Amino acid sequence: MIPFGGTEIQHRFLSHYVDDKLLDNFQICTSIPGKVELDKNKINILWQKNSYDQPNIYPWFEDKTNHDKYDWYIFNSHWNYEKYRYRFDIPTHKCHVIKNAVNNFPVLTPYKTGDMVRMLFHVTPWRGLNVLLGAMSLLQDCNVHVDIYSSCKIYGEDFEKQNEEKYEPLYEQARRLENVNYIGYKEHSFIQKFIYRYHMFAYPSTWEETSCNAALEAMAAGLYCIVTNYGALYE
């Protein structure tokens, strides 16, 4: 399995909605400088979706001789752009913000008084799953239920093998709670197909998001979103 997180979703949108002949004029590298070789015959773009403090990113930006290597730096939120501008003094005339997109706008199942409130959590476990489970343990007598689609598998089998075990205690905690249904990884298409069944997106994030596809998709589906204001989530 290849990784299919937010970056891959947005890259697929670009390939789907932009004409191939137009795209062929650009050499687009996502997030990690040098991951895709520069092409002197094309317009070179670094499409930055990762945080400024990542160890495979900030050393490159700290060396200002690198800043002219790309023609454009595209950021997925104003928060992310401002962090790079402030931290690395990047050339602002080469920077632009293009926010993440969604293309799924389902009709939400209406909530009726007395129905079970169905919540959704479909992000990686280090982004606040521990906080959500703590909250759910306090809601045992309420008519509230959460389905948890959380796993390291979204970033590929190698990443899963290296990291999944450390989150097993959280998954086990989820399995023990009666108002929590731990499902684990499901493909993005599955979540998009069935998101209309939920009423709320519960995301007590402890992670500085540079953007959040999961929140955007939940909002587009009409879910009530409970999120923190960490990183770019307020946008």
Language-model features and meaning:
Residues 1-33, 38:
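N-terminal pre-catalytic "stem/leader" segment of glycosyltransferase-like enzymes
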Residues 27-56, 67, 71-75, 96-98:
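Active-site proximal beta-strand in glycosyltransferases
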Residues 71-85, 90-107:
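Donor nucleotide-sugar binding/catalytic pocket of nucleotide-sugar-dependent glycosyltransferases
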Residues 111-128, 133-137, 147:
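Conserved donor-binding/catalytic core segment of Leloir-type glycosyltransferases
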Residues 160-186:
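Nucleotide-activated donor-binding/catalytic signature segment of Leloir-type glycosyltransferases, i.e.
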Residues 192, 215-220, 234-235:
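Short alpha-helical segment that forms part of, or immediately flanks, the ligand-binding pocket
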Residues 192-198:
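Short alpha-helical donor nucleotide-sugar binding micro-motif in glycosyltransferases
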Residues 224-227:
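Short hydrophobic beta-strand element within catalytic cores of glycosyltransferases
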